[in-house]
Amino acid sequence: MIEKIWSGESPLWRLLLPLSWLYGLVSGAIRLCYKLKLKRAWRAPIPVVVVGNLTAGGNGKTPVVVWLVEQLQQRGIRVGVVSRGYGGKAESYPLLLSADTTTAQAGDEPVLIYQRTGAPVAVSPVRSDAVKAILAQHPDVQIIVTDDGLQHYRLARDVEIVAIDGVRRFGNGWWLPAGPMRERAGRLKSVDAVIVNGGVPRSGEIPMHLLPGQAVNLRTGTRCDVAQLEHVVAIAGIGHPPRFFATLKMCGVQPEKCVPLADHQSLNHADVSALVSAGQTLVMTEKDAVKCRAFAEENWWYLPVDAQLSGDEPAKLLAQLTSLASGH
């Protein structure tokens, strides 16, 4: 229902307009306060890059963060990552992730980023505290990438990158809750790079698509072509589950059942195993896999995806960030 409201297909969005106006008024006032220096943002001693979005829901932001961290690491840059840690609840903040940190503590996306990149990752509702925690333990870190947080103006930033769903884009264009917008589309004029996940990019936007890899078994780490798996039940607890189901079909998989889950939804063995009958194979997103690995069964697999950016702009962006991180 919410997708129909945000896309404008359902007229119910009109009933929510008063709340949207209030949301827009408050969010605009907050940004203006920081712009006029009525509120002061904390500036880190090293460059900060924000990877965020203008809309609620899945835009491919986390794959962009992983891509960015890995690309900078390949260039010899030491990167730290901070996040709010949505879906997690730590005993205290900031929380610096380790091999023992669970998604219940830190949230699924920070754990995924930590496992994929090996970069220092810290979570806190106050992102400046997360930055300080990383620098205290890893003083050699040269640049911070913040996963989400475009609207978290308490943390000063040097570069802003926005990820957009190229198919859904901005829906009906209204602020939450009548529409999907956290900020209006005009905000794109002030950011440094716009990365468009799928669809048809517009002038000045960087095209991106998500390239699926081989399916990975949660228990053994065995890899195989996902099309070899039979009697597949697909689950996806991401911002836009239909994208994952479409990816499976593109890979030649025709799931017997597709189960969309809420983004950041907590998972347990009883609930997940109940989705699969005898002889069926469970295939999930990598984001779900980090929550299920501890109690996975032998027929549970995940399909990782990697961001692939096209054109000349990605190289220019990476050169800019490498120069910033190197201090010249």
From Swiss-Prot:
One of its GO terms (cellular component) is plasma membrane. It comes from the Bacteria. It catalyses: a lipid A disaccharide + ATP = a lipid IVA + ADP + H(+). Keywords: ATP-binding, Kinase, Lipid A biosynthesis, Lipid biosynthesis, Lipid metabolism, Nucleotide-binding, Transferase. It is an enzyme of class 2 (transferase). GO terms for molecular function: ATP binding; tetraacyldisaccharide 4'-kinase activity. Pfam families: LpxK. Signal peptide: none annotated. Coiled coil: none annotated. Pathway: Glycolipid biosynthesis; lipid IV(A) biosynthesis; lipid IV(A) from (3R)-3-hydroxytetradecanoyl-[acyl-carrier-protein] and UDP-N-acetyl-alpha-D-glucosamine: step 6/6. Belongs to the LpxK family. This is Tetraacyldisaccharide 4'-kinase.
